[in-house]
Amino acid sequence: MKFGWIKTTGNDSEERIDSVKDALESSIPGILVKREEINSVRELGNIKIVSDSLDADVVLINKGEDLEILKSAKLSGKETAVYVVINTKDDEIYATEVSKLDFVDYVILEGSDWTIIPLENIIADLFGEEIKLVSVVTNVKDAEAAYEILEKGVDGVVLIPKDINEVKDFSKLIERMNSESVKLDYATVTKIEPVGSGDRVCIDTCSMMEMGEGMLIGSYSRGMFLVHSETVENPYVATRPFRVNAGPVHAYILCPENKTKYLSDLKAGDKVLVVNKNGETRESIIGRVKIEKRPLFLVEAEYNGENLRTILQNAETIRLVGEDGKPVSVVDLKVGTKVLIKPDENARHFGMAIKETIIEK
């Protein structure tokens, strides 16, 4: 996962504290601050503090300072970082060497001229090492380049922002860099029938979803259906753009990092994957899970000769995603209707994808 921090800017403490507020409002997880401002930052909110103090969450030293400070910090349970300004080849060598120390968690690299920072060399030298490389940049365009350099890119970026808009753009970039892409395809509906009542799960998130977005849900790991969010206007109830009426308690849901969970295991604070009709994804936090007894519908579909099934609430407001990415209500499904699914050849063990023969029916 790529991450991003902000370095506070401004000529006085008030300006720098404003940078902290900007970071918090934009969900930036960490910030570099002066040691004398640590307490003021903690009063503003919960954010990872990086500073040259043992009171920080990440204890920072500059090149040439005593590495024993970081050893002590590590023993006390802190994360550690070394800040290196790259001006010469010797600086590059130093950065590579400290990156291999087992008590250093982050190496933060700043170049006097971004265009000639030898990040490529350092990334190549440290391939396979546990260290997290962080690049200091002054604009979002350079941040994107740093994340992507040599395909692997740096693990994190420290942005020195000009204003709040740049901080917001940086936050969006981090979200985009961490978004997963899933392959979707069409399956053909072969059966729709009511099956009686059962306990179904509504997932209310902390995000507003858009038309074409939903979550991947299914009875089988080998094929999950894109269940549309409640964003479609209808004459019966108001829209709930934050909600997906997902299905019964037994069903799988696709979560971040290609993991699955049972719907019955979800709770407030968990992260789920919101997926759109193009397979683009973003993470969303669950605000509430509601489990209620409701009438249910079996949906069966065929994909490449295999039968896939899921069960959904029997209600007009529950929709899958049909051809052209348009939502189609379960009450309007017919034999032959095409619906979007995520095919998967892997089995699942405690939510993890594994190569194993498994029969689901």
Curated annotation (Swiss-Prot):
It catalyses: 2-amino-2,3,7-trideoxy-D-lyxo-hept-6-ulosonate + NAD(+) + H2O = 3-dehydroquinate + NH4(+) + NADH + H(+). Keywords: Amino-acid biosynthesis, Aromatic amino acid biosynthesis, NAD, Oxidoreductase. Its EC number is 1.4.1.24. Coiled coil: none annotated. It is an enzyme of class 1 (oxidoreductase). Signal peptide: none annotated. GO terms for biological process: amino acid biosynthetic process; aromatic amino acid family biosynthetic process. InterPro entries: DHQ_synth (IPR002812). One of its GO terms (molecular function) is 3-dehydroquinate synthase activity. Belongs to the archaeal-type DHQ synthase family. HAMAP family: Arch_DHQ_synthase (MF_01244). Catalyzes the oxidative deamination and cyclization of 2-amino-3,7-dideoxy-D-threo-hept-6-ulosonic acid (ADH) to yield 3-dehydroquinate (DHQ), which is fed into the canonical shikimic pathway of aromatic amino acid biosynthesis. This is 3-dehydroquinate synthase. It comes from Methanococcus maripaludis (strain C7 / ATCC BAA-1331). The gene is aroB'.
